[in-house]
């Protein structure tokens, strides 16, 4: 059962347009903290702190998880209307100027809060761009929602903080819980 859908994420980002640039990193940071129990470094500025120069996020994870590779990773977030343009621009910028990061030892994540709807699939895009990095991953709204739905605490935080008017109905073995 999906509590959180891609359409909900896209709507949240469009309704919270001014906040979305800082909200997307906060969501991903909370997901990383929730999923990764063996982090040795986490820097993902969010909210008002997103204007710091450099990568949007740097993570060192000692144990591989479903969504975060083992080792060092760098993260770029984009809330622009053209996700592909943003991803291509960030990839080119960081590949040309990696800011001291050893690309062959680093996984590069590009995150956008919209469903990927381009002729080239994310898998094809990743395959075409992974030569210079240890690995490259594109996380779109679909991947983010799968991750959110695997982390109920983060999902509940978003719904309580930003989607309080969303109808949620959860059936459990013991009882039905509803909110309108």
Protein language model features and the residues they cover:
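Mixed-charge (Asp/Glu-Lys/Arg
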Residues: 1-179
């Amino acid at each position: 059962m999906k509590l959180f859908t891609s359409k909900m994420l896209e709507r949240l980002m469009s309704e919270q347009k001014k906040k979305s640039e800082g909200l997307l990193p906060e969501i991903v940071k909370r997901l990383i903290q929730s999923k990764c129990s063996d982090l040795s470094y986490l820097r993902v500025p969010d909210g008002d702190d997103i204007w710091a120069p450099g990568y949007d996020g740097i993570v060192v994870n000692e144990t591989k998880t479903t969504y975060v590779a083992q080792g060092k990773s760098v993260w770029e977030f984009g809330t622009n209307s053209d996700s592909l343009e943003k991803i291509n621009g960030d990839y080119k910028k960081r590949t040309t100027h990696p800011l001291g990061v050893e690309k062959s030892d680093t996984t590069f994540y590009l995150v956008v809060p919209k469903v990927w709807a381009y002729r080239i699939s994310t898998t094809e895009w990743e395959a075409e761009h992974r030569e210079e990095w240890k690995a490259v991953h594109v996380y779109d709204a679909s991947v983010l929602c799968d991750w959110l739905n695997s982390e109920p605490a983060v999902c509940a935080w978003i719904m309580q903080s930003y989607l309080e008017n969303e109808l949620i109905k959860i059936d459990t073995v013991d009882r039905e819980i509803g909110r309108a």
